Design a protein with these regions (language model features):
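Register position in tetratricopeptide repeats
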Residues: 32-33, 66-67, 100-101, 133-134, ...
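Canonical positions in the second alpha-helix
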Residues: 45-46, 79-80, 113-114, 146-147, ...
Length: 449
C-alpha cells in the first residue's frame, strides 16, 4: 500500500517516498545520498514513462532545489501544481522556491493557495513572510489574522504580533502579546516587543515594569534581550548593557551601544573592544560608522576609510575625512558632493582652500559660516579672504570670531596677517603676539624674522 506524502517543511526533508518500481527507488536513494544531479535525472526518467507520478514530481523539485537549480525547481513544482492542483505540497514548495528566487509576490500567491487547500500554520507563516518581503506589511498581518485559530503555537502568535507592529497596528498587537505571555510566560521576544510598544505609546514606566516581570520569569541567555530593552529605556544604561553583553556576547546591539558610549566619552581605543566584536557578529552600517569614527580619532586612516566605505551613504563624510588625511583631496571632494550637511560643506571649503582654490572655498565657507557662525569655519573663511587679497573683509570676519572665541590662536594669527597687509604694523604685532602666546607656531616663526 502506498505511503502518504508528508508535508514539505523545509522542502520535504525525509521524504519517505513510495517505491513503485526500481527507478523510483533508485531516485530516492540518490536523493537521500545527496547526489542531487543524478537523482534529478532518475526522477525525470520516471516522469518520462508516467507523468502522473506524484512522488516523482515532488522528488524532482526537491532534488533541483537542493542542487541550487532554482529556476528548474520552480518549473518542476509549477508542473506539479498543474498536474495535481489539489495537492498542498506543490503549492507550498513553489512558494519556498519563489522566495529563494527573490519573487515575494509570486511566493505569496503560492502560499495563499497552499493555505486554501490546507490551513496549516506553516502555510500562513509562509504567506505572511512573502507579503512582508514584498513590502505589504498590512496584508501580511491580515493573512496571519485570517489563519489564527485557538490551537496556533506561540511562534505563530509572536509572528502575528510582529506583523501587526510592522503594519503600524501597535495597539492591536498588545492583546496578542498578553495572550501569548499568558500561555508562555518565558517568551522573551514577546516581553521585548510588548515593552517596546508600551514605550512608543508613551508608557515608559509601564514598559519598565513589564520588563521587570519578564526578567523575573525568563532564564538564561534570553534575558539579555530584555536587559538590552531596559537599557534603552534607562537613564543609566551602561550597567544593564554590560550585563546583557556578558549573558550573550552575540548580542551585537549591546556591544555596539557600549562601544559608542566609549567613543562619545573620548575613548576610541576602548570603543574598539566592543565595536569590533559587534561588527564581526553583525556587520551593520551603524557599527561600521562607529568604527570609522574610532579609527579616525586614532589617526588610523586606512581603517577609517575602510569602515566608512562599508557604512554606505551614512559614511560618506567620514570617508572623505579619511581620504583627505591619506592625501587624496580630489577623491574627498568627490565624496562630499553627495553630502549636504553644513559640517561637510565647511570641510569641503577647507579642502578647496588647501588646494589653492580660494574663490571656490570662499563661496562654500561663506554659506556655511552664515548658517552656523562656527569659529572654526570662520577662521577658514578669513583665510580664504586673505588668499584673495580682501584684507578688510577678512579683518571684519576675524574680529567677529574673536568676540565669540577670544582664545583661538588661528584667528589671532590670521588677523595679524590681515592687519599687516593693511599696513597697520602695531596692531598686527599685537595680534601675532597674542597668537604666539596661545601656541601658534606660525606666529612665533613670523615674530622671529
Amino acid at each position: 500500500m502506498m505511503k502518504p506524502i508528508p508535508k514539505a517543511l523545509p522542502l520535504l526533508l525525509g521524504l519517505g517516498l513510495a517505491l513503485a518500481q526500481p527507478s523510483l527507488e533508485q531516485a530516492e536513494a540518490l536523493l537521500k545520498a545527496g547526489n542531487y544531479a543524478q537523482a534529478a535525472l532518475a526522477y525525470e526518467e520516471v516522469l518520462a514513462r508516467d507523468y502522473g507520478r506524484l512522488e516523482a514530481h515532488l522528488g524532482l523539485g526537491v532534488a533541483l532545489f537542493r542542487a541550487g537549480r532554482l529556476e528548474e525547481a520552480r518549473f518542476a513544482f509549477d508542473q506539479m501544481v498543474r498536474v495535481f492542483p489539489e495537492r498542498y505540497e506543490g503549492h507550498f514548495n513553489l512558494g519556498q522556491v519563489y522566495l529563494r528566487l527573490g519573487k515575494p509576490q509570486e511566493a505569496a500567491g503560492a502560499f495563499a493557495k497552499a493555505a486554501e487547500l490546507s490551513p496549516s500554520e506553516e502555510a500562513y507563516l509562509g504567506w505572511a513572510s512573502a507579503l512582508a518581503q514584498a513590502g505589504q506589511a498590512k496584508e501580511a498581518a491580515e493573512a496571519l489574522k485570517k489563519g489564527l485559530t485557538p490551537e496556533r503555537s506561540p511562534a505563530y502568535r509572536l509572528a502575528l504580533a510582529q506583523a501587526l507592529y510592522a503594519a503600524g497596528a501597535r495597539a492591536e498587537a498588545v492583546p496578542v502579546l498578553y495572550g501569548l505571555l499568558n500561555r508562555d510566560p518565558k517568551a522573551a521576544e514577546a516581553w521585548d516587543l510588548l515593552a517596546r510598544i508600551l514605550a512608543e505609546e508613551g508608557l515608559k514606566a509601564r514598559a519598565l515594569r513589564e520588563l521587570d516581570r519578564g526578567l523575573a520569569l525568563v532564564e538564561g541567555k534570553a534575558r539579555a534581550r530584555l536587559l538590552l530593552r531596559k537599557a534603552l529605556l534607562s537613564p543609566s544604561p551602561e550597567p544593564l548593557l554590560r550585563e546583557a553583553y556578558a549573558l550573550d556576547p552575540s548580542l551585537w546591539e549591546a556591544a555596539y551601544l557600549l562601544g559608542r558610549a566609549r567613543l562619545e566619552a573620548g575613548d576610541p581605543r576602548g570603543a574598539l573592544a566592543f565595536l569590533l566584536p559587534a561588527y564581526r557578529t553583525s556587520p551593520e552600517p551603524e557599527v561600521a560608522l562607529a568604527l570609522a569614527g574610532a579609527y579616525l580619532a586614532l589617526k588610523d586612516y586606512p581603517n577609517a576609510y575602510r569602515y566608512a566605505d562599508e557604512a554606505g551613504p551614512s559614511g560618506l563624510f567620514l570617508k572623505a575625512q579619511a581620504a583627505r588625511a591619506l592625501g587624496r583631496r580630489v577623491e574627498a571632494l568627490e565624496l562630499l558632493e553627495g553630502v549636504n550637511a553644513l559640517e561637510a560643506q565647511a570641510f569641503k571649503g577647507s579642502i578647496l582652500l588647501e588646494m589653492g582654490r580660494a574663490e571656490e572655498a570662499l563661496g562654500v565657507l561663506r554659506t556655511a559660516y552664515t548658517a552656523q557662525k562656527s569659529p572654526e569655519v570662520g577662521v577658514n573663511l578669513g583665510a580664504s579672504l586673505l588668499a584673495l587679497g580682501r584684507f578688510g573683509e577678512a579683518e571684519l570676519v576675524l574680529r567677529e570670531i574673536l568676540q565669540a572665541a577670544p582664545r583661538m590662536a588661528a584667528a589671532w594669527y590670521n588677523l595679524g596677517l590681515a592687519l599687516k597687509a593693511l599696513g597697520r604694523e602695531a596692531e598686527a604685532q599685537r595680534a601675532l603676539t597674542q597668537a604666539a602666546n596661545l601656541g601658534s607656531a606660525e606666529a612665533k616663526a613670523l615674530l622671529r624674522r
